[in-house]
UniProtKB/Swiss-Prot annotation:
Catalytic reaction(s) noted: N(6)-dimethylallyladenosine(37) in tRNA + (sulfur carrier)-SH + AH2 + 2 S-adenosyl-L-methionine = 2-methylsulfanyl-N(6)-dimethylallyladenosine(37) in tRNA + (sulfur carrier)-H + 5'-deoxyadenosine + L-methionine + A + S-adenosyl-L-homocysteine + 2 H(+)
Protein name (database record): tRNA-2-methylthio-N(6)-dimethylallyladenosine synthase
Gene name per UniProt: miaB
Gene3D superfamilies: Methylthiotransferase, N-terminal domain, tm_1862 like domain
InterPro entries found in the cross-reference section: Elp3/MiaA/NifB-like_rSAM, Methylthiotransferase, Methylthiotransferase_CS, Methylthiotransferase_N, Methylthiotransferase_N_sf, MiaB_methiolase, rSAM, rSAM_horseshoe
Length: 470
């Protein structure tokens, strides 16, 4: 039987989808080459209302395909499944299986049971029984991998529904994490992203407050690992030893995603964020003093209940002061069951939209100005999979700088995703750069793995290492 997994939401869900694919293939399922398959799995998000609406809209489209016989079974997992549970069957009775965030490994059995009994099956567990790292994983990338170090969150942000869906923080032991990274590197992986809801509280479960900084140093020392990243930290628990580890460990990239949410102390207090703007600015200052070329990115919520124009101006002022390389900006979305959803002074949509556009205008201007500083500089890029399938055959490539910026460039030689190329930046836009023809190229084991996974024609093109003849 064939399967496909559609993913909504954050990096946690992306990695969970790799696990879902892994457990299905372990049971003999084969990945479909299209959006249609015998089994369609929707791995959902519950953070914002528009994600809910999009999901239920897509479910309606799947009904027609199921009636036409193009799909046999539909399974729904992820945070929305954990939240809505039986409501999914009420809204979409054509769904066959609903499973939660704590029991990904149960999916094959639930699918079998549903086919055998010809009934809908649901299994939602409220607690994580075993860490999901024990499940098989089907990774899409040959050069980059997620490695989960913790699941769940102990924070109580008033706008966030995630802790009630993912549970309290559970930490993996350092030895298990390092063993997984070593195994990945032996398979050709060059870049690892350590993943957790709040990575810098890693170690709280086994009583080691310096565990995350220590993990960065040990992971960065693994031979063959060229790039090490992490997401996401929390300003309240972020400490100097993590910045020191970033500075001292060559493999750790000069990039830091530090969620701000608001520049107003009053709103941060209402959000129950456990830090204030001064603490945030101190972290940024220390990071830039020790790592001058670091790129800082962030998350910002616009229109939180009770946000005044003065509060919003505090956010604009802080954004102007910090000068983020990029920012994920969101309009506040009330989530039922969170304290913020029942707060007074919910902000009208037109005001939220107007503020959101002002913030975007400011951040886009800053991002462009910061990117223009790179024009004329040489940067080493990790070649990534581009958006167009034919781009590599036309000698057009996409890569990421060490600080995470996206660069489009050309190269006379055939490159593989996972190779490195050094280019000179010749043009800047707010959220991408353009490089001249590659100056140097460095082949990697990750590129070799990509060749093994792709067709013979591509392999012949690449292995010559010569310019294409037109």
């Amino acid at each position: 039987m064939t399967y496909t997994v559609r993913t909504y939401g954050c990096q946690m869900n992306v990695h969970d989808s790799e696990r879902i694919a892994g457990v299905l293939e372990d049971e003999g399922y084969v990945k479909s080459g299209s959006d249609d398959a015998d089994v369609v799995v929707l791995n959902t998000c519950a953070v914002r209302e528009n994600a809910d609406n999009r999901f239920y809209g897509n479910l309606g489209q799947l009904l027609q395909k199921k009636n036409n016989g193009r799909i046999r079974q539909i399974a729904v997992g992820g945070c929305l499944a954990q939240k809505d549970r039986h409501k999914i069957f009420e809204k979409a009775p054509w769904v066959d299986v609903v499973f939660g965030t704590h029991n990904l490994g149960s999916l094959p059995a639930l699918l079998r049971r549903s086919r055998h009994n010809k009934t809908a099956e649901i299994e939602i567990k409220d607690f994580l029984e075993t860490f999901p790292s024990s499940l098989p994983v089907r990774r899409e990338s040959n050069y980059s991998a997620w490695v989960s170090i913790s699941v769940g969150c102990n924070n109580t942000c008033t706008f966030c529904i995630v802790p009630s869906l993912r549970g309290k923080e559970r930490d993996r032991r350092p030895g298990d994490i390092l063993a997984e990274i070593s195994a990945l590197v032996s398979e050709g992986v060059l870049e690892v992203t350590l993943l957790g809801q709040n990575v810098n509280t890693y170690g709280v479960e086994f009583g080691d407050r310096s565990a995350f900084a220590s993990l960065l140093r040990k992971a960065g020392a693994i031979e063959g690992l060229e790039r090490l990243k992490f997401t996401s930290p929390h300003p309240a628990a972020f400490t100097s030893d993590v910045i020191d580890a970033m500075h001292d460990t060559q493999a750790v990239l000069p990039q830091l995603h530090m969620p701000l949410q608001s520049g107003s102390d009053r709103i941060l207090r209402a959000m129950r964020r456990s830090y204030r703007a001064g603490k945030f600015l101190k972290i940024i200052s220390e990071a830039r003093n020790k790592i001058p070329n670091i790129a800082i990115t962030t998350d910002i919520i616009v229109g939180f209940p009770g946000e005044t124009e003065e509060d919003f101006q505090d956010t604009l002022n802080l954004v102007a002061e910090v000068r983020f390389a990029s920012a994920f900006t969101f309009q506040y979305s009330p989530r039922p069951g969170t304290p913020a959803a029942s707060m007074p002074n919910q902000i009208p949509g037109d005001i939220v939209q107007e503020r959101y556009e002002r913030l975007l205008d400011l951040q886009n201007r800053i991002a462009l100005e910061e990117n223009r500083k790179l024009i004329g500089k040489e940067v080493e890029l990790l070649v990534t999979v581009g958006g167009r399938k034919d781009s590599m055959l036309d000698n057009r490539y996409t890569g990421r700088t060490p600080c995470g910026r996206l660069v489009h460039f050309s190269c006379l030689h055939q490159l593989r995703p996972g190779d490195f190329a050094t280019v000179k930046i010749i043009y800047a836009a707010p959220y991408h750069l353009i490089g001249d023809n590659a100056l140097t190229v460095r082949r990697t084991p990750a590129g070799d793995v990509w060749i093994q996974k792709n067709d013979t024609r591509s392999a012949q093109l690449v292995s010559l290492g010569m310019p294409r003849i037109r």
